[in-house]
């Protein structure tokens, strides 16, 4: 096997680099901006976000009373300020004879996340796969990378995690592979938490003599949630107590089924220390990448993702970037998250100065006017003035915008079932299995518990990152939370619930599941009125006068009219309520009053009017 460090650009001549840079097409950022006017266009109601009933009624040219009545008849108690969700607006549009469509308004604040690159197929070239090596501490991640890139990086001590974040490229059998060398799954999950699709393939390192450990399981959780293909590398096969079948079984329990067991996950056996299985691993990566058909356009200005950024004493703000598409070059004008600048200097993974970087290439640049965040998208354009304006606006918007709450635990699946995502950590396996058993026995119609992760040990920052990504509630049993992790959870908007009595967890989860369900709306009888006198009014119709027999009558409540024990009308809203000339909110038993009903005038003296409210009740 011959493995050697790949050069960033094939340097047959300096003229080739210059030709690549000069021939790149520009990215027209302004053409990506899209202003969406909410309203009816050609019989279609177009909207960008949720609206109140008052706002929605004006946009579709309907009286708000029609909308409120429709929702009341559906059992939904509401008013002008009630916020309608996407489903409700769609239902109302269909009720009033309109089709509906949600569109995304793209502006300077969100264009990096929504920009679409429509590269012609003939401009696309194969790009190297980006691979993240993950696994438990001391199972051989760093040794594996050392062996692959043929450099003697000092091995980490047992119990520690590689501190630097970087990326490396190797060439094998004329194929480039980019390895994302992280402190483990932490950086990987941070990227996913902000929506950055950084990694194509995950290589999961498992020690043959140790099997799956907590960090291995965490790595699997992150990879599965991100839907990234997994290749398992069983390391330390030279150990006497290697137990492959045990590892296959443990992987199957985590929904990773190996090819040997009839699944699709490739497993490579070897020893990173003794250079065994490396060829097979690289071949597996290339095969997986071929199946994925990874391509990008190198013939335009570049865009990509930020790996990490920091302040360098000598160079100012520096950022480690990954080129996803296009070609990045020195002297390019670049916007990275909120910050912009001119690429003054660019180095590759060997810290060797380079002039250009192709897709899937990791680089470090200097020249920005601030420090971006990990996961920030970036883009290059020829218009320096525009980038400066965008940078200033994005920074201003960030200052004005309140921090979003990433800890919302409520999700809804495609069947309309409400889901509560939970990450569970306990002190030992016995309590873990007991709690999982109790939670599996909970049955709440219309709601479902989804255990995103269940493991032994203290809560850590990786758990918080996964909770943020999956919008999960964190539940811990008989374990402590360090002040560092607690502060991190607070900063991420994640709720941690700590228990020491198992049944309290079951009760709380059951309560939360019931709480996320939409309330059940029922009719609550509040009074009755006998009609004794009628008046006609030219503008408001028939006014019914009567005495309250029981309970009370309220304005905006509903009425059901009984005439000789026969129901004449129901669901009629009480529009106005008066005592003499005074408008009143309610009248109690024994009092006289006059009132009108919405869309009903056919009263008869002697009618009994049953008064009720529609109230929401929680699920019990």
UniProtKB/Swiss-Prot annotation:
Stretch list, region G1: 135-142
Region (G2): 160-164
Domain of life (superkingdom): Bacteria
Localization annotation: Cytoplasm
Residues that coordinate or bind GTP: 135-142, 181-185, 235-238
GO cellular component: cytosol
Gene3D superfamilies, A to Z: P-loop containing nucleotide triphosphate hydrolases, Translation factors, Translation initiation factor IF- 2, domain 3
Keyword check for Chloroplast: no
Region described as G5: spans on this chain: 271-273
Function: One of the essential components for the initiation of protein synthesis. Protects formylmethionyl-tRNA from spontaneous hydrolysis and promotes its binding to the 30S ribosomal subunits. Also involved in the hydrolysis of GTP during the formation of the 70S ribosomal complex.
Family note: Belongs to the TRAFAC class translation factor GTPase superfamily. Classic translation factor GTPase family. IF-2 subfamily.
Protein name according to UniProt: Translation initiation factor IF-2
């Amino acid at each position: 096997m011959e493995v050697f460090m790949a050069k960033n650009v094939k340097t047959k001549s300096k003229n080739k680099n210059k030709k690549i840079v000069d021939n790149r097409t520009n990215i027209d950022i302004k053409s990506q901006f899209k202003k969406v006017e909410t309203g009816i266009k050609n019989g279609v109601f177009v909207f960008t976000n949720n609206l109140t009933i008052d706002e929605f009624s004006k946009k579709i040219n309907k009286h708000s009373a029609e909308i409120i009545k429709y929702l009341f008849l559906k059992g939904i108690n509401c008013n002008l300020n009630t916020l309608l969700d996407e489903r409700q607006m769609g239902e109302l549009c269909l009720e009033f004879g309109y089709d509906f469509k949600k569109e995304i308004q793209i502006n300077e604040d969100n264009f990096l996340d929504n920009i679409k690159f429509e590269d012609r197929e003939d401009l696309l070239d194969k790009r190297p796969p980006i691979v993240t090596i993950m696994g438990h501490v001391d199972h051989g991640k760093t040794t594996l990378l050392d062996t692959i890139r043929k450099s003697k990086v000092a091995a980490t001590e047992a119990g520690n995690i590689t501190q630097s974040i970087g990326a490396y490229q190797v060439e094998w059998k004329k194929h480039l592979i980019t390895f994302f060398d992280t402190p483990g799954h932490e950086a990987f999950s941070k990227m996913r938490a902000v929506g950055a699709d950084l990694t194509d393939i995950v290589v999961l390192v498992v020690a043959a003599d140790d099997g799956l450990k907590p960090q291995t399981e965490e790595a699997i959780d992150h990879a599965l949630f991100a839907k990234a293909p997994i290749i398992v590398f069983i390391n330390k096969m030279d150990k006497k107590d290697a137990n492959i079948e045990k590892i296959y079984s443990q992987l199957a329990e985590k929904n990773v089924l190996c090819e040997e067991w009839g699944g699709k996950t490739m497993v490579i056996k070897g020893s990173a220390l003794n250079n065994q299985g490396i060829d097979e691993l690289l071949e597996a990566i290339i095969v997986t990448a071929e199946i994925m058909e990874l391509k990008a356009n190198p013939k335009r200005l570049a865009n990509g993702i930020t790996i990490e950024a920091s302040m360098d004493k000598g160079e100012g703000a520096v950022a480690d970037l990954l080129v996803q598409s296009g070609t990045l070059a020195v002297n390019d004008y670049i916007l990275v998250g909120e910050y912009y600048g001119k690429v003054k200097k660019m180095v590759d993974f060997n810290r060797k100065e380079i002039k250009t970087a192709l897709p899937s290439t990791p680089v470090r640049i200097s020249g920005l006017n601030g420090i971006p965040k990990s996961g920030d998208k970036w883009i290059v354009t020829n218009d320096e003035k525009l980038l400066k304006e965008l940078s200033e606006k994005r920074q201003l918007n960030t200052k004005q915008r309140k921090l979003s709450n990433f800890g919302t635990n409520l999700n809804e699946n495609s069947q309309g079932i409400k889901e509560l995502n939970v990450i569970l950590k306990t002190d030992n396996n016995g309590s873990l299995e007991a709690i999982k058993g109790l939670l599996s026995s909970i049955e709440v119609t219309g709601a479902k518990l989804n255990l995103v992760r269940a493991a032994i040990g203290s809560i850590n920052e990786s758990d918080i990152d996964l909770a943020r990504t999956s919008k999960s509630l964190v539940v811990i049993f008989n374990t402590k939370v360090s002040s560092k992790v607690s502060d991190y959870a607070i900063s991420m908007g994640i709720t941690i619930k700590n228990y020491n009595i198992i049944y309290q967890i079951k009760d709380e989860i059951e309560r939360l599941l019931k709480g996320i369900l939409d309330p059940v709306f029922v009719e609550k009888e509040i009074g009755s009125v006998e009609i004794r006198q009628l008046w006609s009014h030219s503008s408001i119709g028939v006014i019914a006068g009567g005495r309250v027999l029981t309970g009370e009558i309220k304005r905006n409540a509903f009425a059901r009219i009984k005439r000789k024990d026969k129901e004449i009308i129901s669901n009629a809203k009480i529009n106005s309520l008066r005592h003499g000339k005074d408008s009143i909110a309610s009248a109690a038993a024994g009092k006289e009053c006059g009132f009108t009903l919405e869309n009903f005038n056919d009263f008869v003296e002697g009618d009994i009017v049953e008064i009720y409210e529609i109230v929401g009740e929680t699920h019990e």
